[in-house]
Amino acid sequence: MAKPKIAVIFYSTYGTNHGVAEHAAKAAEAAGAEVRLRRVRETAPKEAVEGQDAWKAQAEKMADIPEVSHDDMEWADGYFFSAPTRYGVSASQLRAFIDTLGPLWQAGKLANKTVTATTSAQNVHGGQEATTLSLYTTAMHWGAIIVAPGYTDQSIYDAGGNPYGFSTSAGGFDDKGRAAVAHQAKRLVEMTRKIRG
């Protein structure tokens, strides 16, 4: 049986979602998947990025990670998304990439793929669940199959109890969070394997 192909796709301003994505990629590989770790293209003006030392440092840290492409979306059997929350939805950088996927969607090339999502926000009640649900709404339009973690492992409870997908306050990716992300990535691989046969 071929290994499930998982694209771990992230956008990160200050590093939280980068850390989540790297951990998810390692966990998916450990669960038997072939993995591509991809970052979303930065669309903010250069002066905005360079005007904040932490943002600039994070952009430099991620520079060697390939940008996600339509080829990656077509290649993958499943997607693990991680992006920060902005006003109750995903950061515009991720939304901008998703908005380019019309040709793949129209050709049915996003249908029957598995999807799971994680996020972070500045505050505990800063729209984290809404962000994850909005990504799942997009997946429904694609005809994709949502693989939420639910309450299928103690790690979900330990990390705050979000059944839609791991979420955290900015900078709060600790050992409990890593365990929850590893479980979510492993579950994505397992469900993708079952669906792909």
Annotate each language-model stretch with its function.
Residues E47-G51, E129-A130, D158-G161:
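Short aromatic-enriched loop/helix-cap "lid" or pocket-rim segments at secondary-structure transitions
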